[in-house]
Structures are given as C-alpha cells and as structure tokens.
C-alpha cells in the first residue's frame, strides 16, 4: 500500500501556555541507610529490574494499536476563530504533516475550529510502501507523543517536536526493514539514504 493515509488524535494541549504556570521542581530529599540495608536495596532493585525487563518483553510482543477516533459527518471547512487570529497551526516535513484541525479522511474538508484534535497525514508523496500494520505503528507512536505532551502549549514548536520524533521513527522502520521505498513513486531521491543490499556470506556471489 503506497496511498497516503491520515489519523486524527484528540489532544489535551493548553492554548494559554502551560497549565497552572511554571511547573514546580520536586524537592530533593537526602537519606542515609546502613550497609545491610544497602544490600537489601540492591537486591530489591535487581528483582525489580528483571520484572521490568520481562514486562517490556511482554509489551513488545503485543501489537500497539492507535485509539479509535469516531468519524464525523457533514464536516465543513472552517478557519480558526478570530480570537486566535486565524493562525495556521501546522508542522510539515517530508513524510509527516500535522495540523491542529479535524480533516475528513474522505472529503478532505478542513475544520480548523476543532483545535482539540491533531490530524496526521502520513507520507503524502508516497515515497514508501506501507501496510496497515506499519501505518498503525506510526499512528500509535503519534498517539503516545500526543499523550506525552499533554499540557504543553499548542504551538507550532510543539507540533514540530512531535513531527521530528515521527520522522526518526519512520527512519527506524526503514532501517529495520519494516517499510521499503516505493520504486513506483513519482520521484526517487531516497531521502532517508540509498537502499542497502544484504548479502549472505555463506553463499558464493556471482562475480565476473
């Protein structure tokens, strides 16, 4: 699948700066323990580390799916309200376009008044070949980033941070062999590096 796809995530960003003003730093507390307690603590930490590693393995085995978003009907293109100056909040890179709006995936109607939603348009130039599984991986990662930046100001800078992280994630998928270049794309410029060919050292190569 090389067609462009999109995904919309609900946000809890702040449009008036950081919620509650500046975040207070947690107070640092010093404490002292005996040598016996130190050994018990180290043993407990090792057990906890093993349990965390096992839990990570279990989570990696499960395929992450993005949270479903209820589709809307009769969506009409609307600009931002006057109180926000009609500004265009977006982050556009080669493979990731993020808009602070709801975009109908069928009609492409653009409703900028729904600022509580971020719409991701993935690989608009069809440079890569995507499957539903790899698309869902990107969408799930996008949802994780949106949750991570909860409470952050809704600005282009925040959207660029999210878009940059997704670009790095797409590069990782390419290097891991989960996606590949679309050789039928309109332009082949291999923006994330030239394709790499892996040889099997156990088999002789035909060399003339």
UniProtKB/Swiss-Prot annotation:
Region (Disordered): 37-70
Primary enzyme class: translocase
Transit peptide start-stop: 1-21
EC number, UniProt record: 7.1.1.-
Start-end of Low complexity biased regions: 37-49
A Pfam match: NdhM
Record's catalysed reaction(s): a plastoquinone + NADH + (n+1) H(+)(in) = a plastoquinol + NAD(+) + n H(+)(out); a plastoquinone + NADPH + (n+1) H(+)(in) = a plastoquinol + NADP(+) + n H(+)(out)
Example GO molecular function: quinone binding
Any single GO CC term annotated in Swiss-Prot or TrEMBL for this entry: chloroplast thylakoid membrane
Family designation: Belongs to the NDH complex subunit M family.
Quaternary state and interactors: Part of the chloroplast NDH complex, composed of a mixture of chloroplast and nucleus encoded subunits. Component of the NDH subcomplex A, at least composed of ndhH, ndhI, ndhJ, ndhK, ndhL, ndhM, ndhN and ndhO.
Name this protein carries in UniProt: NAD(P)H-quinone oxidoreductase subunit M, chloroplastic
Organism field: Vitis vinifera (Grape)
């Amino acid at each position: 699948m090389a067609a462009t796809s999109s995904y919309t995530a609900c946000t809890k960003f702040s449009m008036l700066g950081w919620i509650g003003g500046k975040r207070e730093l947690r107070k640092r507390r010093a404490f002292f323990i005996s040598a016996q307690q130190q050994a018990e603590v180290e043993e407990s930490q090792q057990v906890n580390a093993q349990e965390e590693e096992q839990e990570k393995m279990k989570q990696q085995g499960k395929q992450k799916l993005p949270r479903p978003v209820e589709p809307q009907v009769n969506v009409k293109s609307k600009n931002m309200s006057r109180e926000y100056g009609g500004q265009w909040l977006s982050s556009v890179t080669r493979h990731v376009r993020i808009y602070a709006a709801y975009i109908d995936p069928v009609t492409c109607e653009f409703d900028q008044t729904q600022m509580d939603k971020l719409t991701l348009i993935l690989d608009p130039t069809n440079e890569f070949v995507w499957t539903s599984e790899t698309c869902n991986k990107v969408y799930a990662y996008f949802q994780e980033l949106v949750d991570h930046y909860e409470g952050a100001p809704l600005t282009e800078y925040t959207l660029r941070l999210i878009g940059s992280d997704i670009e790095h994630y797409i590069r990782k998928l390419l290097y891991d062999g989960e996606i590949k270049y679309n050789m039928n794309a309109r332009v082949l410029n291999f923006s994330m590096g030239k394709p790499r060919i892996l040889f099997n050292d156990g088999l002789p190569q035909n060399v003339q």
